[in-house]
Amino acid sequence: MERPQPDSSMPQDLSEALKEATKEVHTQAENAEFMKNFQKGELTQEGFKLVMASLYHIYVALEEEIERNKENPVYTPLYFPEELHRRASLEQDMAFWYGPRWQEAIPYTQATKRYVQRLQEVGRTEPELLVAHAYTRYLGDLSGGQVLKKIAQKALNLPSSGEGLAFFTFPNIASATKFKQLYRSRMNTLEMTPEVRQRVLDEAKTAFLLNIQLFEELQGLLTQKAKDHDPLQAPELHRRAGSKVQDLAPTKASRGKPQPSVLSQAPLLRWVLTLSFLVATVAVGLYAM
């Protein structure tokens, strides 16, 4: 009598099953407007401060629940506080971005609160689901997070020494690739029933959806603030701009002497026009390719 063959479409390892189960929501998170702008380097200091403050609240909640359950066999194999925990690093970043009284200054948005509440609920009532949240956060930080660090450093003109970006640095991990392999292998040793395993997979999707809601909220806040500070509503800016144009206007020339052009009197303007021409040329060339 032949034994029934296992369903080859369902990954046997938990790490692979998580990757497969979250593929669609992972793509949705990457395509959120906030993240698309981030990936393109269209990042403002205000937007970066907002997302970093949200991450601070999220990681405080996550790591408090991890500490609560560090001796619980449903999580113990994944307990790597020295290598992974982000709270101390985020506290450094909060001080950099918000100043010495940062605890009184950082925002706490509604989507962030919902994320925190879910982490607290899981840690206290269903600690086995912490695996899903640790997977989505820490492995993401060790992967795409390193790319985002470089983008933020360039877009915000941050020092190469890493101030303001401690969150993205893992000084106790020599090789991110090897550590991720170790972490996944530990995940695959966790013993759980098929029912618990499915709940872990579902919770990983929930974690991504919480991130998507956060990105949408942050983008909405930035968009609203941009509208509130529309330069078209700032007459003082128009007055100053008008005065600069007046300064560049040609003066009455002496008889018999040619009047210098605006460009010859304004080397900065001449440089900007030249640079604009070069950028347009490069853009057209790339489009043609």
Curated annotation (Swiss-Prot):
**The protein's enzyme class:** oxidoreductase
Residue intervals annotated with topology Cytoplasmic: 1-266
Chief location bin: endoplasmic reticulum
Q: Which CDD domains match?
A: HemeO-like
GO cellular component terms attached to this protein's record: cytosol; endoplasmic reticulum membrane; nucleus; perinuclear region of cytoplasm
Keywords, ordered alphabetically: Apoptosis, Endoplasmic reticulum, Heme, Iron, Membrane, Metal-binding, Oxidoreductase, Phosphoprotein, Transmembrane, Transmembrane helix
Q: Where in the cell is it found?
A: Endoplasmic reticulum membrane
* Residue stretches of biased makeup (Polar residues): 1-12
What reaction is this protein's catalytic activity? heme b + 3 reduced [NADPH--hemoprotein reductase] + 3 O2 = biliverdin IXalpha + CO + Fe(2+) + 3 oxidized [NADPH--hemoprotein reductase] + 3 H2O + H(+)
Entry binding sites for heme b: 19, 26, 135, 184
- Description of its domains: The transmembrane domain is necessary for its oligomerization.
Name used for this protein in its record: Heme oxygenase 1
The organism encoding this protein is Bos taurus
Lineage of producing organism = Eukaryota, Metazoa, Chordata, Craniata, Vertebrata
